[in-house]
Amino acid sequence: MRLTDKVAIVTGGAGAIGREITKLLAREGAKIVIADVNTEANSRMVDEVKALGSEALAVCVDVIEIDQASKMVEAALERFGQIDILVNVAGGSTGPSIKTKMDFFARSEKTRGEEILRLNLLAPLNCARAVINHMMERRSGAIVSISSTAGVIGMMKGVEYSAAKAGIVGMTVTLAKEAAEYGIRVNCVSPGIVGTERVFKMAPDRIPQWEKGIKLGRLCKPEEIASAVLFLVSDESSYITGQNIIVDGGLCLGPEGY
C-alpha cells in the first residue's frame, strides 16, 4: 500500500468527489480526517473507511472560517499526532444565476459571488495556512487542491467560480515555491465535467451536448479524480510540485483545428 502510516485530511470528504478520494486513500493505508459540514454524511464516511480497514476521524467544520480550519488541524493532531497530506476538495457552485452574458456586469448584489469566492478560494487557503507550520516542522508533506477547468478556459455564466478556481492554480504555484525548501510538495487537480449524481439529476438534457465537446466522448468519473490525487500525494510523484494536473478527457483541447 502506498500510504501506510500516513495521515490525510480531506476537506469536503463526504461529498461526491471527496468520498471517492477518501476511500481510495484509505484503501492505500492512510488514516483519514474527514472534514465536512454535513455531520450525518461524515459519520457514514467514517464507517466506510473503517470497513476498508483503516482509521478515520470526522470533524464537522466550515473551513471558510480560519478558526474552523485551525480546529480541524488541532483535532487531527490530537487524534493521530501528525498530518502528512491535505486534500482541499470542499468547494462548488450553486449554479449560474445570470440569464445573459452581460447580467454579471449589470447586477449590484454581491452576496452570492462573495460566497462562491470564499468557498472555492479562501477555504483552501485557510486550510493550507492551518496545516503548513506543522508540515514545515516535520519537513515533509503533500498538499493537493481541487481546481477546475473553469479556471483554465473559463465557464460561461460562472465568473466568480472561474476566478476562484484560477486563483487555486496561482495559490498552488506560489505555495509550491515557498514550501519546497521544507520538503513540502503542492499541486492541484483540475477536473473537467464530472459525472456526479448531482450533475445527472440537475442537467440530464445537457449531458449529450457536453460529451460532444469532450475529446474522449464522456464525462469524468469521480474515481478518476481520486486516482490523480492519489498519485500526487504518494511517493510516485516525489519530484512533482507546483503543477496543475488537468483531468478533463480533452475538454480543454477545444474544437478541431486545421
Where are these regions (language model features)?
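Canonical Rossmann dinucleotide-binding motif of NAD(H)/NADP(H)-dependent dehydrogenases/reductases
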Residues: 3-33, 175
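Substrate-binding pocket helix/loop in short-chain dehydrogenase/reductase
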Residues: 96-114, 199, 210
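Active-site helix of classical SDR
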Residues: 128, 164, 172
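Residue(s) in the substrate-gating loop at a strand-loop-helix junction
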Residues: 148
